Amino acid sequence: MGGWSSKPRKGMGTNLSVPNPLGFFPDHQLDPAFGANSNNPDWDFNPVKDDWPAANQVGVGAFGPRLTPPHGGILGWSPQAQGILTTVSTIPPPASTNRQSGRQPTPISPPLRDSHPQAMQWNSTAFHQTLQDPRVRGLYLPAGGSSSGTVNPAPNIASHISSISARTGDPVTNMENITSGFLGPLLVLQAGFFLLTRILTIPQSLDSWWTSLNFLGGSPVCLGQNSQSPTSNHSPTSCPPICPGYRWMCLRRFIIFLFILLLCLIFLLVLLDYQGMLPVCPLIPGSTTTSTGPCKTCTTPAQGNSMFPSCCCTKPTDGNCTCIPIPSSWAFAKYLWEWASVRFSWLSLLVPFVQWFVGLSPTVWLSAIWMMWYWGPSLYSIVSPFIPLLPIFFCLWVYI
């Protein structure tokens, strides 16, 4: 009893070797489900079967202590399932069965019809005819797309993905856009703060230069300390409110601010005129025609059909303007000169001097350049306060 036998078994429980796949009930009637019955006992080829009483003994198996199923449990009847550890040899296989030394040649790629059979369908005529079907083209071409026969599925894939994300939820926010959105205003704020601090030093620098003209060869000292309200020694550019020179300091800085404002205004007018936004036409010298007369602007641009006039009126002819192509910046300068000469007649006396200065020889120009080079360092101390205004003028010139 308990041994393996090839003879047919009769009745239930005659053999406690439990020849059934569940491993708990001897000669169970579920054997036919696995192609076994009492007349065919050889369906279970497990030669190592535990006797039924052995299931109550303490042993180490797949189910832990105190339970050793007769067939070794649902993990099988292998030695590992029975709880028996087998030492495996760690000797590597010989080189003849492992791999050969040296680089082996690359195997020949199989034909395309074997490796990618779907590609053969793509090259078929029926496949291309199907792509031309309007119902199929509507799946991979956007609305209003090109009607040409060239298939370009790249943008359609992106639109398809975007439509899916719109249905499933918002896409993940791009951190690069967030970073650039924060860094841009911060850099602009930092540059603006730097320019503001530099611009605020312009009045003080010009004030120092202005007051230094009264103290040639010595250090500027405020004269208010010798008055009825004496104060400590200080510079005339930093007078306290109790100093009598405080009013003069405020007046000087107010004039300096007006000068800077006028400089910025002139630059802005030149810039707008350079962009063609100020269609100016100078007054006619020696005539009573005003800017509101018939010769105000050119009826037809002299250079093509440009959007802004690029010419100026020289003399009226039968109520019409005779236009010549003149750059707008020269037109603006001529307009300012003639506007000033109408109101200040003495400026006309400077015209011969200007014409003489323009007609000088190159030797005179080289001498002027040499003098500018000689007095350059002293002029730099005067021009240096206006250097912070150059970035602002450059930005206005580019973006306006």
Curated annotation (Swiss-Prot):
The large envelope protein exists in two topological conformations, one which is termed 'external' or Le-HBsAg and the other 'internal' or Li-HBsAg. In its external conformation the protein attaches the virus to cell receptors and thereby initiating infection. This interaction determines the species specificity and liver tropism. This attachment induces virion internalization predominantly through caveolin-mediated endocytosis. The large envelope protein also assures fusion between virion membrane and endosomal membrane. One of its GO terms (biological process) is caveolin-mediated endocytosis of virus by host cell. Its main location: virion. Keywords: Acetylation, Caveolin-mediated endocytosis of virus by host, Fusion of virus membrane with host endosomal membrane, Fusion of virus membrane with host membrane, Glycoprotein, Host-virus interaction, Lipoprotein, Membrane, Myristate, Transmembrane, Transmembrane helix, Viral attachment to host cell, Viral envelope protein, Viral penetration into host cytoplasm, Virion, Virus endocytosis by host, Virus entry into host cell. Residues 1-20, 89-115 are annotated as: Disordered. Residues 2-174 are annotated as: Pre-S. This is Large envelope protein. It is found in: Virion membrane. Systematic vaccination of individuals at risk of exposure to the virus has been the main method of controlling the morbidity and mortality associated with hepatitis B. The first hepatitis B vaccine was manufactured by the purification and inactivation of HBsAg obtained from the plasma of chronic hepatitis B virus carriers. The vaccine is now produced by recombinant DNA techniques and expression of the S isoform in yeast cells. The pre-S region do not seem to induce strong enough antigenic response. Coiled coil: none annotated. The gene is S. Residues 120-174 are annotated as: Pre-S2. The chain crosses the membrane at residues 182-202, 254-274, 349-369, 376-398. Residues 2-253, 203-253, 370-375 are intravirion. HAMAP family: HBV_HBSAG. The lineage of its organism: Viruses, Riboviria, Pararnavirae, Artverviricota, Revtraviricetes. It comes from Hepatitis B virus genotype A2 subtype adw2 (strain Rutter 1979) (HBV-A). A lipid is attached at residue 2 (N-myristoyl glycine).
